[in-house]
């Protein structure tokens, strides 16, 4: 997709899989830049600076960001693409799949009409419940180009039968009215998670409608301490730590799913509220340091 006379601009928090793929472009001396997270003013400034010297300008970002569950400003990106014809959008929406969008097609596709310069990647390995990737192109020509020249297509194999069966079963749910009742149920649990976290005065970094909760703990030492403490209480979740996030932006990454009960959510958050002050004391840190590192208002 990206030619030698194109330029690439990465959001600083775009998924590592995209950043890794871009390393192949660097080997071809393709110009690659990184801008601060969701800073469309910086994006527009770089478009203006690059547009006279490059054929296409690619902006690569996530639809829903994997660490803190926040969103790309999709509608604003579409407006920017309307304004600058050279701008092409490459968005990874795997974390927006199923729980959002019409028929569970994802966060990005739930934001309006498909933009003619949008290249969308998503996948079946998260909320969809099976395995495999999805690539959506603006026209048949681009589709045929990738299908017939991409190493990933040329050298990959077909889905194993059991994965294909799970994919077909999930697709039938997505194509039925059932998907909307499942999405609604998921949202009630996300809302409950956000509400209880606030009631317990936990440092919830984004009060997001996405099912990725992120409770900031600051230092990596505090994060590792919290994981050990919570495992001892029977709770397991991801720790977001450097280099996935900035060094002092360690956090407890808590992906919710529909099978979690309200009691599960309440028990988890209550235990975090109990253990966090002790973990902070152990690492000679404090809640005020968490608020400082994440630029939160107490």
Question: Could you say what each language-model-derived stretch is?
Answer:
Residues 1-16:
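Conserved PLP-anchoring active-site segment centered on the Schiff-base-forming lysine
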Residues 12-22, 142, 248:
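Short, glycine/polar-rich helix-capping loops at beta-to-alpha or helix-loop-helix junctions
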Residues 30-90:
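Active-site phosphate-binding strand-loop segment of PLP-dependent enzymes
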Residues 57, 156-157, 203-208:
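Short beta-strand
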Residues 109-145:
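Active-site PLP attachment segment
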Residues 150-159:
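A short glycine-threonine-serine/GTX helix/turn-capping micro-motif
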Residues 158-179, 185, 189, 198:
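Structural motif of enzymes handling amino- and sulfur-group chemistry
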Residues 180-194, 200-233, 244, 248-252, ...:
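Conserved PLP-binding catalytic core of the aspartate aminotransferase-like
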